[in-house]
Protein backbone atom coordinates (compact mmCIF):
# COMPACT_ATOMS: atom_id res chain seq x y z
CA UNK A 1 0.00 0.00 0.00
CA UNK A 2 1.51 3.34 -0.98
CA UNK A 3 1.78 6.19 1.49
CA UNK A 4 -1.22 8.06 0.13
CA UNK A 5 -3.48 5.08 0.80
CA UNK A 6 -2.03 3.85 4.11
CA UNK A 7 -4.68 5.47 6.32
CA UNK A 8 -7.52 4.26 4.10
CA UNK A 9 -6.11 0.74 4.09
CA UNK A 10 -5.60 0.71 7.86
CA UNK A 11 -9.06 2.10 8.66
CA UNK A 12 -11.27 0.62 5.91
CA UNK A 13 -9.63 -2.48 4.44
CA UNK A 14 -7.54 -4.09 7.20
CA UNK A 15 -10.53 -4.76 9.48
CA UNK A 16 -12.30 -6.58 6.63
CA UNK A 17 -9.44 -8.99 5.90
CA UNK A 18 -8.48 -10.08 9.40
CA UNK A 19 -10.50 -13.27 9.21
CA UNK A 20 -9.51 -16.66 7.79
CA UNK A 21 -9.30 -17.16 4.05
CA UNK A 22 -7.82 -13.76 3.19
CA UNK A 23 -4.14 -12.97 3.06
CA UNK A 24 -2.79 -9.53 2.18
CA UNK A 25 0.54 -10.02 0.42
CA UNK A 26 1.41 -6.36 -0.17
CA UNK A 27 3.40 -5.17 -3.15
CA UNK A 28 5.27 -7.78 -5.16
CA UNK A 29 7.88 -7.50 -7.90
CA UNK A 30 7.45 -8.74 -11.48
CA UNK A 31 8.95 -12.20 -10.85
CA UNK A 32 6.80 -12.66 -7.75
CA UNK A 33 3.75 -11.49 -9.70
CA UNK A 34 4.21 -14.21 -12.32
CA UNK A 35 4.44 -16.88 -9.61
CA UNK A 36 1.55 -15.36 -7.66
CA UNK A 37 -0.80 -15.14 -10.65
CA UNK A 38 0.31 -18.51 -11.99
CA UNK A 39 -0.59 -20.22 -8.71
CA UNK A 40 -3.93 -18.45 -8.30
CA UNK A 41 -7.09 -20.38 -9.14
CA UNK A 42 -8.53 -17.24 -10.74
CA UNK A 43 -8.15 -13.48 -10.88
CA UNK A 44 -11.15 -11.78 -9.31
CA UNK A 45 -11.53 -8.52 -11.25
CA UNK A 46 -14.66 -7.34 -9.48
CA UNK A 47 -14.25 -3.59 -9.80
CA UNK A 48 -16.94 -0.91 -9.84
CA UNK A 49 -15.42 1.53 -12.32
CA UNK A 50 -15.11 1.32 -16.12
CA UNK A 51 -11.46 0.25 -16.31
CA UNK A 52 -10.18 1.33 -19.75
CA UNK A 53 -7.92 -1.70 -20.24
CA UNK A 54 -7.27 -3.90 -17.21
CA UNK A 55 -3.65 -4.96 -17.58
CA UNK A 56 -3.98 -7.30 -14.59
CA UNK A 57 -6.47 -9.41 -16.56
CA UNK A 58 -3.94 -9.78 -19.39
CA UNK A 59 -1.16 -10.60 -16.92
CA UNK A 60 -3.30 -13.32 -15.32
CA UNK A 61 -4.20 -14.84 -18.69
CA UNK A 62 -0.50 -14.81 -19.67
CA UNK A 63 0.02 -17.12 -16.68
CA UNK A 64 -2.90 -19.33 -17.74
CA UNK A 65 -5.06 -18.00 -14.91
CA UNK A 66 -8.73 -17.43 -15.76
CA UNK A 67 -10.53 -14.19 -14.89
CA UNK A 68 -13.82 -13.57 -13.13
CA UNK A 69 -14.87 -9.99 -13.82
CA UNK A 70 -17.75 -7.55 -13.59
CA UNK A 71 -19.12 -6.33 -16.92
CA UNK A 72 -17.43 -2.92 -16.77
CA UNK A 73 -15.16 -0.92 -19.05
CA UNK A 74 -12.97 -3.06 -21.29
CA UNK A 75 -13.77 -6.39 -19.64
CA UNK A 76 -15.89 -7.66 -22.55
CA UNK A 77 -13.05 -6.83 -24.96
CA UNK A 78 -10.46 -8.68 -22.88
CA UNK A 79 -12.23 -11.73 -21.42
CA UNK A 80 -13.61 -14.42 -23.74
CA UNK A 81 -16.70 -15.72 -21.95
CA UNK A 82 -16.27 -19.37 -21.03
CA UNK A 83 -12.74 -19.56 -22.48
CA UNK A 84 -10.49 -17.16 -20.56
CA UNK A 85 -12.95 -16.43 -17.80
CA UNK A 86 -16.47 -15.38 -16.98
CA UNK A 87 -18.10 -11.96 -17.09
CA UNK A 88 -20.81 -11.34 -14.52
CA UNK A 89 -23.18 -8.55 -13.55
CA UNK A 90 -23.09 -8.79 -9.77
CA UNK A 91 -21.75 -10.52 -6.67
CA UNK A 92 -24.43 -13.22 -6.62
CA UNK A 93 -23.65 -14.12 -10.22
CA UNK A 94 -19.91 -14.08 -9.42
CA UNK A 95 -20.45 -16.59 -6.61
CA UNK A 96 -22.35 -18.89 -8.95
CA UNK A 97 -19.74 -18.53 -11.71
CA UNK A 98 -16.68 -19.19 -9.55
CA UNK A 99 -16.74 -23.02 -9.83
CA UNK A 100 -16.98 -22.67 -13.62
CA UNK A 101 -14.08 -20.21 -13.73
CA UNK A 102 -11.70 -22.42 -11.77
CA UNK A 103 -12.65 -25.40 -13.98
CA UNK A 104 -11.54 -23.66 -17.19
CA UNK A 105 -8.62 -25.19 -19.09
CA UNK A 106 -5.58 -23.11 -18.10
CA UNK A 107 -3.75 -24.15 -21.29
CA UNK A 108 -6.65 -22.76 -23.34
CA UNK A 109 -6.46 -19.51 -21.33
CA UNK A 110 -2.76 -19.23 -22.15
CA UNK A 111 -3.32 -20.10 -25.84
CA UNK A 112 -5.98 -17.40 -26.16
CA UNK A 113 -3.59 -14.92 -24.52
CA UNK A 114 -0.97 -15.84 -27.14
CA UNK A 115 -3.50 -15.44 -29.96
CA UNK A 116 -4.77 -12.06 -28.82
CA UNK A 117 -2.28 -10.23 -26.59
CA UNK A 118 1.27 -11.55 -27.06
CA UNK A 119 4.05 -9.29 -28.32
CA UNK A 120 4.50 -11.67 -31.27
CA UNK A 121 0.88 -11.22 -32.33
CA UNK A 122 1.13 -7.44 -31.92
CA UNK A 123 4.37 -7.31 -33.94
CA UNK A 124 2.72 -9.29 -36.76
CA UNK A 125 -0.20 -6.85 -36.73
CA UNK A 126 2.18 -3.88 -36.94
CA UNK A 127 4.00 -5.49 -39.88
CA UNK A 128 0.70 -6.09 -41.66
CA UNK A 129 -0.23 -2.41 -41.22
CA UNK A 130 3.20 -1.20 -42.36
CA UNK A 131 3.05 -3.42 -45.45
CA UNK A 132 -0.42 -2.14 -46.29
CA UNK A 133 0.83 1.44 -46.02
CA UNK A 134 3.74 0.63 -48.32
CA UNK A 135 1.50 -0.94 -50.97
CA UNK A 136 0.64 1.08 -54.10
CA UNK A 137 -2.55 3.09 -53.80
CA UNK A 138 -4.72 5.31 -55.90
CA UNK A 139 -3.24 8.52 -54.58
CA UNK A 140 -3.77 11.82 -56.30
CA UNK A 141 -0.47 13.03 -57.65
CA UNK A 142 -0.08 16.67 -56.71
CA UNK A 143 3.01 17.39 -58.76
CA UNK A 144 6.08 15.72 -60.17
CA UNK A 145 8.27 18.20 -58.37
CA UNK A 146 8.70 18.57 -54.63
CA UNK A 147 6.37 21.06 -53.00
CA UNK A 148 6.25 22.49 -49.49
CA UNK A 149 4.56 20.17 -47.01
CA UNK A 150 1.77 22.69 -46.37
CA UNK A 151 0.82 22.67 -50.06
CA UNK A 152 0.68 18.87 -50.16
CA UNK A 153 -1.24 18.67 -46.87
CA UNK A 154 -3.82 21.14 -48.19
CA UNK A 155 -4.72 18.68 -50.95
CA UNK A 156 -5.25 15.74 -48.57
CA UNK A 157 -8.92 15.01 -47.86
CA UNK A 158 -9.48 11.77 -45.93
CA UNK A 159 -12.64 9.82 -46.63
CA UNK A 160 -15.45 11.08 -44.50
Please annotate each region the language model reported.
Residues 8-35:
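Nucleotide-activated donor-binding/catalytic signature segment of Leloir-type glycosyltransferases, i.e.
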Residues 27, 36-40, 126:
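Short alpha-helical donor nucleotide-sugar binding micro-motif in glycosyltransferases
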Residues 38-52:
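Acidic donor-binding loop of glycosyltransferase active sites
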Residues 54-57, 75:
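Short glycine/serine-rich donor-binding loops of glycosyltransferases
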Residues 62, 66-69, 79:
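Short hydrophobic beta-strand element within catalytic cores of glycosyltransferases
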Residues 71-82, 86-89:
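Short acidic/histidine- and often glycine-rich active-site loop of Leloir-type glycosyltransferases
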Residues 86-107:
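C-terminal "capping" alpha-helix adjacent to the active site of nucleotide-linked donor transferases
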Residues 102-148:
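A charged, aromatic-enriched C-terminal amphipathic alpha-helix characteristic of glycosyltransferases
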